[in-house]
């Protein structure tokens, strides 16, 4: 797992400015744009899993990204239901410890959801994202997914830097953070499946 690489790969793509700006523009298009973001990041995850040297996708499959985003939405909702129920029960009581446990479960569950996205990205079939292997992959490779979770915290903090530039700044840094999180998730999935992450290309 390489958190630094998950961040730096964006800037090693010759067309990264255009690709990130288009990703940022999608934030301003309600629903359709947000779904396209989901489909685009799904392609990014697949590229990392497949070992593509420059995994940041080209913006050349708008319809496919929209359809992929719908699949991401369905997978996210279905896998979100168990943790929503558990956290609702834990948060119902006025107990700080149960609240802390609820938070930990929510954080940990993000790894399970990324594991499901990896199956969806690799197979393209939404049914592949709904099996116990999604959970087992995380449990059997827990150290790898801990690094993924830590990385998402780092990228989340980075995205807040954009607040300095107000709305435009935050969507740019958020777009980079989304790409970095997808890359790290692809790394975690690939390593969990027993494949080494390819060496970083030199430019």
In which residue ranges do the predicted regions lie?
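Short helix-loop boundary/capping segments at the starts of domains
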Residues: 34, 50-54, 72-75, 79
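Membrane-helix interface/capping segments
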Residues: 46-60, 86
């Amino acid at each position: 797992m390489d958190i630094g690489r998950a961040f730096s790969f964006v800037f090693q793509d010759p067309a990264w400015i255009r690709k990130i700006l288009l990703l940022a523009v999608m934030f301003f298009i309600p629903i359709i744009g947000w779904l396209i973001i989901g489909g685009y990041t799904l392609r990014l995850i697949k590229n990392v899993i497949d070992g593509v040297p420059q995994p940041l996708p080209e913006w050349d499959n708008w319809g496919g990204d929209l359809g992929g985003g719908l699949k991401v939405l369905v997978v996210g909702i279905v896998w979100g239901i168990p943790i929503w129920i558990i956290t609702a029960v834990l948060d119902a009581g006025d107990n700080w410890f149960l609240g802390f446990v609820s938070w930990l479960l929510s954080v940990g569950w993000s790894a399970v959801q990324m594991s499901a996205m990896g199956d969806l990205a690799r197979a393209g079939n939404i049914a592949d994202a709904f099996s116990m292997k999604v959970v087992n992959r995380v449990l059997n490779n827990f150290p790898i997914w801990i690094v993924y979770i830590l990385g998402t915290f780092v990228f989340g903090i980075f995205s807040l830097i954009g607040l300095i530039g107000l709305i435009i700044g935050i969507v740019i840094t958020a777009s980079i953070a989304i790409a970095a999180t997808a890359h790290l998730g692809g790394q975690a999935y690939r390593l969990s499946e027993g494949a080494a992450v390819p060496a970083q290309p030199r430019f």
